[in-house]
């Protein structure tokens, strides 16, 4: 069966063998639709200096699918966490002298290196001594994808190039949910009226590092007897203010999006959100809500799908940024013969802490219903009945018996949603999930 998987990057990577076995292995197509709004980690530095869509989740999925082990090592490689060592290693990779190139054939090496050099040239054009690019923990795959996108002028083309170089199966497709060369950010509107802006800030915010502004607040007058360090600090402050508009993110963007999200801990869930999430929305640089359209390639794949899987991962920041795209939500709604399977996470995270299974599902249904209503309104389509049935969006739920998020099957049975329990593991395993999805695919 043709399968479409909507997901983020990291969590679903462990399930890729399952999805391949139920589709590619049987001669059918497998499509991954991924978000482009993750502004955390090394991606945040690329967004800050170069701009463009966030490609961390896309790179993570492609690396998982590559058949060339040498390119898996290259595109999955991260620079050291030390500032000086990271810059040194990056220069060696650009120059072609780094050991990571050793086992890669010369023609593939020069093909990959050309786009990495293109990325280096872009960084050099935008270098500012007051706030330079931070290379710590940067992903070489992210650099390659961004360099290819800048050269080719297309995110879709850069993804296709990376997959073909790495000898991915022609039956597997990795598609960004929005086809764009621009940055897209999301915000979370909480039930208490508070707004949190930026995917990383919602799910795993970096610990802020206060900046010393003691000199900046003083008069900008250099005494002849003043120290050289003070003089230099003031000059750098002036340079940073004057150069700010030259960065990829415009000067009028929301202040919270100008902070680096380079250093964060995905496992740090010590602080929950101040209130539950009411809804997720896309915003423009002024903080106003926008409603972008889903990638036409993604729409086409959903129309041909026998099964759409809402995979595990962050509900609010990985799954919903895909499902709130109005045209994508509508084509899922209209796919009457398609199985629509929701995989429930095995544990809570910061975004959904305290939600039971009912409210977890309702968040998806309400978000997609709202997106469809907005999309139809924008097209001037009058709809007398926007009160959709639950099974129009979700036909099956797969959950873990020992998972933290409780599922009351009787509630969902009333809405004609079938529930499938996995009792043999504490986390979603590829082999067990494969059995369940095959059974779902056989049902009428």
UniProtKB/Swiss-Prot annotation:
Organism this protein belongs to: Saccharomyces cerevisiae (strain ATCC 204508 / S288c)
GO molecular function: LPPG:FO 2-phospho-L-lactate transferase activity
Coiled-coil stretches: none
InterPro entries, A to Z: CofD, CofD-like_dom_sf
Note: Present with 1100 molecules/cell in log phase SD medium.
SUPFAM superfamilies named among the record's database cross-references: CofD-like
The protein's name: Uncharacterized protein YNL011C
